[in-house]
Amino acid sequence: MVNRKDISLNYNRRESTTSVVGSLGVGSTYPIRIQTMANTDTNDIEASVAQAKRCFEAGTELVRFTTQGSRETESLREIRNRLQGYGPLVADVHFNPNVADLAAQYVEKVRINPGNYVDPARVFKHIEYTDEEYQAELQRLRERFTRLLNICKEHSTALRIGVNHGSLSDRIMSRYGDTPAGMVESCMEFLRVAVDEHFQNIVLSIKASNTRIMAETVRLLVAQMDKENMHFPLHLGVTEAGEGEDGRIKSAVGIGSLLADGIGDTIRVSLSEAPEAEIPVARALRDYFADPESIRYHGVSVAIEGDTVVYESDQTEWAMMQLQAAAECGKWLLGEQKQVRLANNHFDEEKLRTLEKDILQAAGLIRYKTEYVSCPSCGRTLFNIEEVIREVRAATGHLKGLKIAVMGCIVNGPGEMADADYGYVGAGRGRISLYRRKECVLKNIPQEEAVAALLELIKQDTNNK
């Protein structure tokens, strides 16, 4: 007989310092903050303002905008002017530190990506560095990053250091590999400079589309910060989680696994849908753990039986049952447990068994149906990602066991989908590139031909096996 260990459900926040984003405090002395990212063209000021208002009215507390260049930065300045009184805005900057310098003068927060802030765009090549060359690169990083820190100090601008698994620099990859340790070091390089420069107004994120890698890396970052006496607030999210029920369950597994241990000061549920659709999901996850009146503390029991986590709930809403079961079980399934058993008298057995499989797939333990990785899209995406996902799903849904990525652009696309079997990546207006794992096999083909070409590629590979 398998021993049963009942789990005591409690919630204790990890202590973190405070970051001030406009008038919004982020850190362990404040509620977990909810945020989203606009998917409009930042230069379309009317559409961007309208979408941001919808998001704030839906309950988000921050809205992030893609900020590719100086034109987008000036557009964001006008968007900021039109949204006075709604909430803080965040500029999302990749590849161009000069844009970050400018944006830091206009909005309450700037996000930079260590993988492409000073290092050149990733080309997936191993580059050998001597110790002297590596240190020279770190000194270059220090000099350039210090300039941004000084601007942020002058304008009371918060900074998010946001590492993505899909966009680690070739420099980091060459020394640490495609590993959680590499992601953590990519972040710590910047944190050490900030601490040396006495800049504390920082929030960190360290994300991946793989829930197991995401959770492991965040925990490793917390441990490394503790070793170096740093306690910055953390933003949580699963990149490219997808859409619909699968996207929600995957986000819940990843984010919930950390919230369950009190890790996380702000969250975003990244869905390939309208950004305002993300907010109720994020709120539900936050409230499940942080609200003492939540059903978690009055109608849920969790137990461990061998390699199985057992989750019993009185939840009467199916959408909430999906989120809460995935969030609660995520911690255990991304740890030592390999199976899940759900019990709820309000729902039939078939529904519960399917949810069990969906949660196991989100945790990377099985793949019983086609898995889709898709980004939430942003102003860099030049096609309607929701329509494309539906088209790709309709064409490939019968291909059980495959993992297919649909990515809006090249910022995270090739990297985040590296463990996908095939990838559909935006390459320009009306143009798509198709990937087999990391290899680009068809470049800049017309969008209207892309799904058929993807199917043909899969067919050829299947026939050649």
Q: Each predicted region: which residue ranges?
A:
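Conserved, mostly hydrophobic/aromatic
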Residues: 34, 92, 161, 204, ...
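Short, acidic/polar
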Residues: 42-54, 95-100, 187, 251-255, ...
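Glycine-rich phosphate-binding active-site loops on the catalytic face of alpha/beta enzymes
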Residues: 60-62, 107-124, 261-276, 331, ...
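Active-site beta->alpha loop and helix N-cap motifs at the rims of alpha/beta catalytic domains
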Residues: 60-189, 315, 319
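N-terminal amphipathic alpha-helix/helix-capping segment at the start of soluble metabolic enzymes
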Residues: 1-37, 149-155, 291-305, 390, ...
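Catalytic domains of carbohydrate-active enzymes, especially glycoside hydrolases
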Residues: 48-66
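Short, well-ordered coil/turn segments that N-cap beta-strands
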Residues: 28-32, 59-61, 84-89, 106-108, ...
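Catalytic alpha/beta core domains of metabolic enzymes, predominantly
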Residues: 128-145, 149-150, 173-397, 403-406
